[in-house]
Regions:
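Short, polar/charged alpha-helical segment
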Residues: 29-51
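Ligand-binding clefts/hinges and TM-proximal coupling segments of bilobed small-molecule sensing domains
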Residues: 129-144, 148-154, 234-272
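Short helix-initiation/N-cap motifs at beta->coil->alpha
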Residues: 52-63, 150-179
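Short, well-ordered beta-strand elements
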Residues: 20-29, 48-54, 121-122
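A bilobed periplasmic-binding-protein/Venus flytrap-type ligand-binding module shared by bacterial periplasmic
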Residues: 102-113, 215-229
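Ligand-binding "clamshell"
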Residues: 83-95, 108-110, 181-183, 188, ...
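Beta->alpha turn/N-cap motifs
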Residues: 56-58, 68-82, 99, 173-174, ...
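A conserved helix-loop-strand patch within extracytoplasmic ligand-binding domains
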Residues: 95-145, 243
């Protein structure tokens, strides 16, 4: 009898230990929705209880992971993560790429690039990494020329050799870029903020050609990169059922898909 009770107690302890509270941080945008619909159900089957934590400023989710207040965050690309690690002395690492909406050039006043007049005002994200992305979109449109040999992830307006369209480039907080559409002719808006504001990627006058360093990631503390919860998150994103769910939802059309997605009826024209 004693052995049975001891065995039952050990089973209860093992069951309790297999379940865990998992705190995941997000900024405004589509990543929480994709996680809740496609990742959380897989994790819950493994015994996890998911707690969603929302942040409003870019450094906050990383600070929370560094301090152990949350386990992981999903909101940033690796270039931003590395810059944060350096400036804030964090030690966070990416564990898996996630489907990511690209930055785009939007306007409430014009329906095509051809309609945009000389001297138009363009708002761009003020942080250096995303300023560079915005300037590359303007260059791809043929509106500005970037000096040769410039660091491609640290461009600024000073690195333009020509601005034949005489654009007025105005830096703004990235999260406020969608609201700047009320005052500016155009706005370069990061995909997550565009989606959070209710814009569709198909509304953009031009989308960036998103390369892998700008595809967003799940980030954790380096000491947790091999932890079971981190491995389970990676497995959930790489699971075929997540890919099927993502590619079957028209809301996510136009996203840059991670390289581990296998070719099917792709949801992203930007997939390599």
């Amino acid at each position: 009898m004693t052995h049975r009770l001891l065995g039952a107690a050990l089973l209860l302890i093992a069951t309790a230990a297999s379940a865990a509270d998992l705190k995941v941080g997000f900024m405004p945008g589509p990543y929480r929705d994709a996680f809740a619909k496609g990742i959380a159900p897989q994790l819950e089957k493994k015994g996890y209880t998911i707690q969603y934590v929302e942040f409003s400023q870019g450094v906050q989710p990383n600070d929370a992971v560094e301090r152990g207040q949350i386990d992981a965050n999903i909101f940033q690309h690796t270039i931003y993560l590395e810059a944060n690690n350096k400036s804030q002395k964090f030690d966070l690492v990416p564990i898996v790429h996630v489907p990511t909406p690209p930055m785009g050039l939007y306007s409430k006043r014009y329906k095509s690039l051809a309609d945009v007049p000389e001297g138009a005002t363009v708002t761009v994200p003020q942080d250096p990494v995303n300023t560079a992305r915005a300037l590359r979109i303007l260059a791809a449109a043929g509106w500005v020329t970037i000096k040769p040999g410039v660091d491609p992830v640290a461009l600024s307006e000073r690195d333009l050799s020509a601005n034949p369209k005489k654009l007025k480039i105005i830096p703004v907080d990235a999260a406020q870029a969608p609201r700047s559409l009320d005052d500016a002719d155009l706005a370069a808006i990061q995909g997550n903020f565009a989606v959070a504001y209710g814009l569709r990627l198909t509304e953009a006058l031009k989308l960036e050609d998103m390369t892998l360093p700008y595809v967003n990631v799940v980030a954790v503390k380096r000491s947790n990169k091999d932890a079971k919860f981190a491995q389970d998150i990676v497995a959930a994103y790489r699971a075929p059922e997540f890919q099927r769910l993502f590619e079957s939802n028209a809301v996510w059309k136009g996203y840059r898909l991670p390289d581990y997605f296998t070719p099917t009826t792709t949801a992203s024209s930007g997939k390599p």
